[in-house]
C-alpha cells in the first residue's frame, strides 16, 4: 500500500499534488465551518427533570417476578428504574445566540410540577417547546442520555404523544442534543452536576441531591420548584462556557451570566436560590469580566 502522506518520487508527482490540493481544500472547509458555527444564529433548550417513583407498580412487578437473593442469601432490593418514574418536575430555558451580539437572548425559564399540572400536560408543554425550537435548535441536558431521554421516550409511547425530532435519533451523539456530562467527561470519571459546578465556581443545587427525591415524595413542591430551576440555571452557564470554548457561539461570559440572572429573577422573584446565590454570583461575574488582570477575593487573600 502506497503511503501518500510522504513525498513520492517523480512518478507520483501528480498524485502528490492532488493530495496536497485536497488537504488544503479540507483544511479550508474546516476553518470556514468553524468560523460560520460561531457567527450563525443558534438556539438551545436547556432542561432538567425530577421524578416521583411509582412504588406500587414497581412492587407489583417485583412480586410477580419473585425475590432475588445475593450470595449470602439476603433478599436484594431492586432499584426502581426509569419505566417506574413519574415526571414530578421539569424546568427549561431557551438561549438564543444571533452570531453577532456578545449577549445572548434568554427566554424566561419555565418550571412545571405535579403540584399544578398532570404529567401528560408537562410532557405536552415540553414537547411543544422542543417542536417550536426547530430542527436546527439543540436540546441540552446534564446526563440526560442516562435516564431523562429514556423516560421521555417511554412516556411518549405510554401516552400516545408524538415525540419531538430531538428524541428521534437514539444515538448518544445525536446532532440534535448535547449531553454536557458526556461531552465534558469523555473517558474521564463521570461527575455530578453540582460536583462540576463546585469545581468551576458556579452556584448549584439549593437542596442536597440525595434529598430531592424525599422532597418530591413529601410533596414539598416549593423546594422542588427551586431545585429544578437551579439545575437549569447552572447547566445553562456550563453550556455557554462549553460552547464558547469550542467556538460554537460568541458570548461575553459576564454579560451572559447577567442575562440569565435578570430574566430568571423577573420570572421567579421569590426564588431563594436566585436571590441568595445565583444573582450575587452573576453580578460578581460581570464585575470580574470588566476588569483586566487577576481579581482577588477576600477569602483568597486571607
Give the positions of each predicted feature.
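DEDD superfamily 3′-5′ metal-dependent exonuclease/proofreading module
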Residues: 1-302
